[in-house]
Amino acid sequence: MAGKGKTAARTLEDLTLDSGYGGAADSFRSSSVSLCCSDTHLSYAHGGNCWHLTESMHSRHNSLDTVNTVLAEDTEILECSGQCAKLPELEEDVPWSLGEVEGALRKDEELCVGNASREILAKLSALVSRALVRIAREAQRMSLRYARCTKHEIQSAIKMVLSWTISVNCITAALSALSLYNMSTGDKFSRGKSTRCGLIFSVGKFFRWMVDSRVALRIHEHAAIYLSACMESLFREVFTRVQRSALVEKENGVPKFSVESLEQAINNDSELWGLLQPYQHLICGKNASGVLSLPDSLNLHRDQQRAGKTGEGHAYSQAELRTIEQSLLATRVGSIAELSDLVSRAMHHLQPLHIKNPSNGTPVHQNRTGSVHWEPEALYTLCYFMHCPQMEWENPNVEPSKITLHTERPFLVLPPLMEWIRVAVAHTEHRRSFSVDSDDVRQAARLLLPGVDCEPRQLKADDCFCATRKLDAASTEAKFLQDLGFRMLNCGRTDLVKQAVNLLGPDGINSMSEQGMTPLMYSCVRGDEAMVQMLLDAGADINSEVPSSLHKHPSVYPDTRQGTPLTFAVLHGHVPVVQLLLDARANVEGAIQESTENYTETPLQLASAAGNFELVSLLLERGADPLIGTTYRNGISSGPLGEMNSYSLAAAHGHRNVFRKLLSQVEKDKGDVLSLEEMLAEGSEAVERRAPQNEGTLRTGKAKLRALREAMYHSAEHGHVDITIDIRSLGVPWTLHTWLESLRTCFVQQRRPLIQGLLKDFSCIKEDEYTEELITHGLPLMFQILRASKNEVISQQLSVIFTQCYGPFPIPKLTEIKKKQTSRLDPHFLNNKEMSDVTFLVEGKPFYAHKVLLFTASPRFKSLLSNRPAAENTCIEISHVKYNIFQLVMQYLYCGGTESLHIRNTEIMELLSAAKFFQLDALQRHCEIICSKNITNDSCVDIYKHARFLGALELAGFIEGFFLKNMVLLIELENFKQLLYEVPADSPGPGPSYDVLHDLEQTLALRIRSIHLSTSKGSIV
């Protein structure tokens, strides 16, 4: 083995504490290595190089043969179905619908979705829901440290659960969605979160699902955006890989999927198969056949080819490449020295690749990823899980044990080394550390191995302690002493405070750890009331802040910046500690200073999000301002006080009692404060003209109105309709989006009284606020309610809405078809036996005509004349047409137009049928125009049915406009209600089958688009 002798001579400290690469850095000549496929190995579409279980793998002659080593015990493959714990099946409790899944797949134009059946979509949804559960479980564990789930927890969970390649794609999609969301501040309350993010999946549904699943006490809206974008991207990733499978048949160029082909494609994909299994542990790096393979992102073959063309890099031999591959794919080791060498080699090649695909949310930390190294205890812990006692038998000085007390883990459940590194390093990066410790490895083992569990990592001062060799001896000694001081304070013994302070360094009691936290902050996290009091008595700064700069404190967690001891006490819900800090005159707003922007949540925001009524009441009593929001660090904010204030956070999480408590807070100068009703009644411009002495009052009223509008938006998005109705009852106006989301929630929850109240409130929405959402989401929802509900009140209210949306403009008129007559005869020849060459038999009476005219009149006449018998005197019998009606048809043809026709009202419908039968378009249109002028409330249903029977779509469309314009009156008529609610059936006539409600929806959509959404505003009607 290359470099084996040299590695054996190095100490474990050298292998772990130097550059992070151990002996691998000088074992090879360059870090730019391609992992190319050997000709003897099969190449898989989604896995790079694959290693099969062959007889040669039984060899024990080399430690690198630990790749896919097959032990005798492995012949009995683990029956996971009976021994391994399984994930909970979500079934219907997923935050997406099958329609949204199909829409997400069709969003990618390169995907040929075709007509994917509901069976395929349901199977795909069930499989991907397991990935959702895995990501949510990991995010839930990490959220315990700071009692909230942000985008950082979701991102780290994605990196832990998904493979190298898929996680990069999903995080890229999440970053893109969040960027779009942050930039869409102009009309944000009038558009849904998903629309603002460019997503198909509902961000509001994902947020509600995360709250209901208790992923964390507090869910940041960016976390929901990340998770929804990730899952949408994952659906497309899975579908793309299935499409590429050779097992997918094609029908006329369109892929033809089946459940079997879907499962087979996933079984052959080493990056998907384990992810989508139902077991709690995550099977990584191998497919259903047990074949180990490298993911696409670890294959540098193309990069090396490009480097070779430019003269950069170095081409490695097949032996060197095989060594690298075996290092990454090793599943068992025989000793700690062997593991140290394998980890060093793997880190040497994984970290440059990781820098090429950055996905960490903190750029400063990402730039230093190359310095991540493994602590000695981390390697010992990893060796415990990967150790194979049989591999020690190669040593002649070691005699095999005669009695076995332990059962080896079967190969099927052993992950390759690259997966251990991937998960452990993801944990390290999440806590912003530069060294992998033993707890990171234990967390990885809990995820990757069956039957292994450990407690979630707690927030401690030594989380990110690192004695790197880049520090001199004196600095390192000071760090160790400071760490000892933090440990002494964290043990909870108040009698050690003075001794600990002497060890903390020049800043004394206010010294900060690598995480930027003081001893007082850690005591507040633990809820140690006695220690908090001792530290305050010792002079601890009660308003100290976590620094924003990462220069001196590189492991500061992004969402704790500017956090104070009060912030951490509120985060973890320690009411006595909060009371103690407030009594000691801690700033109730945290780190906020007057006239400065707030880049972190205030204690009241955190308490409101968690729904802690006791804490909210306490903070309000001490003067906390519920109107203060958060300004994001990108500088984008729609309001001067920031976003997601306490009202919004309580509403977003569904804490109705907390929201009402915030509303009931009495302003200090109640007599001078404008009420919301006054603000809404007078309007912003009128209020601004008030006396200058009311400027502060004006700002307060405006800020509260803006805060409640924002809260209304979030409560509607997340399905907390009761809170939305509470806000509406205060006089806050609807937007079309919040009204539609509330109506959708009430319909899903079958809350009929609320539906009636919402429908009644539609008239409050101004017509100039109508958007495309009314057509794409509103109309389908309202017609679905009309179809499902036979309630007369709801039907009447919907009729009012449809009539209002149709507008006051007249129904678009039907126009005559100006068709030039190809041939024409004098009316004298009409039904004239002289010179007649064709005779029609109508109701037993002859009707004489001329072929020269009829042959070019229409295709129907041409067919009748062409198919007549050869005998000259044979009559053409016309059935189903009355003699007087046929005479009108012939009069139209001989006169060359409709001007000379005198049609009675009793004849118009029969003439319309005859014109349709003889395919005389101009005559048909003339009849339709006459019908449209004679439509009444009593006759409209019968005329509509006849028009649909004949397939006279123009007339049917006109009558649909009549229905919508007069629906308030028509909905009271029994025959109209029967028309609406009858089950669509195949039409017995020449016209196609129809669904009245669907056709009314389409007609109304066209109308709204023409008069409300077009620039002409009704000029086309």
From Swiss-Prot:
| Cross-referenced Pfam families | Ank, Ank_2, BTB
Cellular component, GO, one term? membrane
Spans traversing the lipid bilayer: 160-180
ANK repeats, residue ranges? 515-544, 561-590, 599-628, 642-671
Recite the UniProt keywords alphabetically. ANK repeat, Membrane, Repeat, Transmembrane, Transmembrane helix
Query: According to its record, how does it sit in the membrane?
Result: Single-pass membrane protein
A molecular function (GO) term? DNA binding
Report whether Repeat shows up as a keyword of the record: yes
Q: Boundaries of each BTB domain copy?
A: 836-902
Q: What is its main location?
A: membrane
Q: Does the keyword Lipid metabolism apply?
A: no
Q: Where in the cell is it found?
A: Membrane
Listed name of the protein:
Ankyrin repeat- and BTB/POZ domain-containing protein 3-A
Species this protein is from: Danio rerio (Zebrafish)
